[in-house]
C-alpha cells in the first residue's frame, strides 16, 4: 500500500529513476502493468539477503524502507522471523545505504514499537534502536524513523476485512468494541515520510498528531456506509499480543518532543557512554509530560 502511494506521488516528477525492491514478484508485475513507465525499475530480493540489498543500492540517492513482517498474531508464533526481517533486515538495508553513499534514508515503524507487548512490536522497537545507533555514528547519510498508527484501508488492516465480511454475509468479528486505534490516510502516511525527509536529522523519530477511533464506532460507520446497519457483529476476544490502546509517544519521549505543528519530532539522544561527565555537568531535567496514546488523542466521530 505504502509503496504504491509513494510511486503515485513521484512517478510524474523529474526524479530520474524509481527502484522497487521486494520479494513478491506478483505484486511487482501488477505494478509494472499498472504504471507502464520506464522510470520504474524492479528488483527481486529480500532484506535478509545482504547481497541482493547491495545490488539494488548502487547509485541510489534516497531510500524509503517499508519492508516488514507486521501481522501481530503470526509474529507471536514465529518471533524469530520478525527478528530476521524487522531487525536484521533493517540493519542490512542501513549498512548497504551507508556503504553506497545514500544521502537520506527514512525507515517506517509502528505505534506497536512503543511499550511493546508482542513480538512484532518488540522487533520494531529494536529496529528503531538500530536506526538511532546507526544515525549516531554516520555523518554522510541521514537516517530517520516515522512511527505510524493504522493506515486506513491499507493491505492487512481491519477495514478491508470488515468490508469483506459484510459483503460475504459473514458476521463482522471484533476483539473488543472499546479498543481504540490511531487512524491516518495513505496520503497522510506519505506526507509524514516526506516531512521527515525534508526536516529530519539522523536518529530522529517523527510522529503525526493523529486522531483515534473505537473499533465499535468504526464498525458501525462501515455498516452504515455499506447500507447494512443491522448486520451481525460478533465479539471474539482479544487476539495474541493485542492492546486495548496504542501509544505513539512515551512519557519520556514527550518530555523532549519538539512540536512541529501537525507532527512531533523526537531528536536522538546523542550522549555517549562516558556517563561520569553527565553526573558532574549539565542541568537537571524537571519536565514531566504524559504519554500520547489512542485513548487520550482527539476522537473521530
Stretch-by-stretch model annotation:
Residues 22, 43-44, 84, 176, ...:
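Conserved residues in the N-terminal Rossmann fold of short-chain dehydrogenase/reductase
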Residues 24, 111, 211:
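Residues in the short beta-alpha loop(s) of Rossmann-like NAD(P)-binding domains
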Residues 1-2:
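Hydrophobic/small residue at the entry helix of a nucleotide-binding pocket
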Residues 36, 41-62:
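Conserved Rossmann-fold cofactor-binding substructure of NAD(P)-dependent oxidoreductases
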Residues 65, 69-129, 133, 143:
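Conserved Rossmann-fold NAD(P)-dependent oxidoreductase catalytic core, especially the SDR/UDP-sugar
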Residues 6-11:
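Aromatic pocket-lining residues of Rossmann-like dinucleotide-binding sites
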Residues 14-27:
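Conserved glycine-rich Rossmann-like NAD(P)H-binding loop of the short-chain dehydrogenase/reductase
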Residues 93, 99, 128-129, 133-301:
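Strand-loop microenvironment adjacent to phosphate/nucleotide-handling motifs in alpha/beta enzyme folds
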Amino acid at each position: 500500500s505504502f509503496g504504491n502511494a509513494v510511486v503515485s506521488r513521484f512517478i510524474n516528477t523529474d526524479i530520474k529513476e524509481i527502484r522497487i525492491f521486494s520479494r513478491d514478484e506478483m505484486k511487482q508485475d501488477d505494478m509494472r502493468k499498472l504504471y507502464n513507465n520506464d522510470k520504474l525499475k524492479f528488483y527481486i530480493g529480500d532484506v535478509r539477503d545482504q547481497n541482493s540489498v547491495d545490488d539494488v543500492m548502487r547509485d541510489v540517492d534516497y531510500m524509503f524502507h517499508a519492508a516488514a513482517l507486521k501481522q501481530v498474531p503470526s509474529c507471536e508464533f514465529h518471533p524469530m522471523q520478525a527478528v530476521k526481517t524487522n531487525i536484521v533486515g533493517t540493519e542490512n538495508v542501513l549498512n548497504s545505504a551507508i556503504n553506497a553513499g545514500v544521502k537520506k534514508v527514512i525507515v517506517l515503524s509502528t505505534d506497536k514499537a512503543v511499550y511493546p507487548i508482542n513480538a512484532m512490536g518488540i522487533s520494531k522497537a529494536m529496529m528503531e534502536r538500530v536506526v538511532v545507533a546507526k544515525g549516531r555514528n554516520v555523518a554522510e547519510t541521514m537516517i530517520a524513523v516515522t512511527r505510524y498508527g493504522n493506515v486506513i484501508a491499507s493491505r492487512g488492516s481491519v477495514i478491508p476485512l470488515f468490508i469483506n465480511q459484510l459483503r460475504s454475509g459473514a458476521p463482522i468479528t471484533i476483539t473488543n468494541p472499546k479498543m481504540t486505534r490511531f487512524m491516518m490516510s495513505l496520503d497522510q502516511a506519505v506526507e509524514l515520510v516526506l516531512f521527515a525527509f525534508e526536516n529530519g536529522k539522523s536518529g530522529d523519530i517523527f510522529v503525526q498528531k493523529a486522531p483515534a477511533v473505537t473499533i465499535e464506532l468504526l464498525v458501525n460507520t462501515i455498516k452504515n456506509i455499506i447500507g447494512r446497519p443491522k448486520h451481525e457483529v460478533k465479539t471474539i476476544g482479544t487476539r495474541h499480543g493485542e492492546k486495548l490502546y496504542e501509544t505513539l509517544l512515551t512519557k519520556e519521549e514527550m518530555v523532549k518532543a519538539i512540536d512541529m505543528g501537525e507532527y512531533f519530532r523526537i531528536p536522538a539522544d546523542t550522549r555517549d557512554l562516558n556517563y561520569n561527565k553527565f553526573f558532574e555537568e549539565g542541568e537537571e531535567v524537571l519536565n514531566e509530560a504524559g504519554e500520547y496514546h489512542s485513548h487520550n488523542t482527539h476522537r473521530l466521530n
